[in-house]
Amino acid sequence: GFHNLAIVKSKQRYPRQARKTCLGLLGAGQMMFLKILVATDEEPSDLNALLDVLNDRVDPKSDLTILDGMVGDSLEPASTYENIHSKLIIDATKLVAADPRSGNPLEGSPVEVCPPWRKGEEDAPGISESLLDEISKLDGIEDCLLLRNSMLVVTVEIEGRPNPRTGAQWPNEESAEAQRSKITQLRNLIWQLDSQKQLRWLFITDNDLDLHGEGINRRLLWQLTSRFAVERDLVVEEGRIFWDATTPIPSNEGPSPVRRWPGITMHDPETLEAIDRFNLPPWPNNLVM
């Protein structure tokens, strides 16, 4: 992981023990600055395995833990306040036998209702190709990628968003309001189209990446976590997760303040030109801003 994210492989002798592991890590030195922790039974470095467990084992109604008003990293510009942010723990581990959701809890303990797919009894539900096609044709959507059958990323063009090289120092209330309005409208439209509520993960981000290009998984891992504040950009409702990772536009007048946004640390054009003289393979799309 990195300062926004840690993916944790956790042993579980007891129900929900992986959550305790994550909470313990938040007390371990620099780990206290983490924004998002994902607990899994799989190899943490395997991004495809991570997508699989997020799709197959995360019930938004019971597997998310949000810690509000925690210590944050000084290098975290997306947070509402400097050095303070909310944290998100995602439990994507298998259910142990004693978990009340397993259907066979300890004697005397009641059963907690749980979807069959969360218990591993059937495949996780997902959206159809026809619904994906409908969503892709919505006005305002630039591109979309179905990461797994219940996980969709859509990209949008946000007018007035901070320039990657220069960032944005001062509030732009008009552009920020237009951004909030556009994102909310798209979320509502997609939720309405998905009347069966099969789409559990909906991510929206800027169109400055190539969803179908080389290295997209790693680029998304960075972009979806660095441009996102748990306290401002996460909506969990009716068993569905909405995750806004469009570049924040500084604002003081919205429901939640947005601080100045820094420019990305990038190689200057002269350095890139000097490297190009060596006739090396071209930079992958998703490494170029």
Regions found by a protein language model. Give the residues of each.
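Charged, compositionally biased interaction regions
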Residues: G1-M289
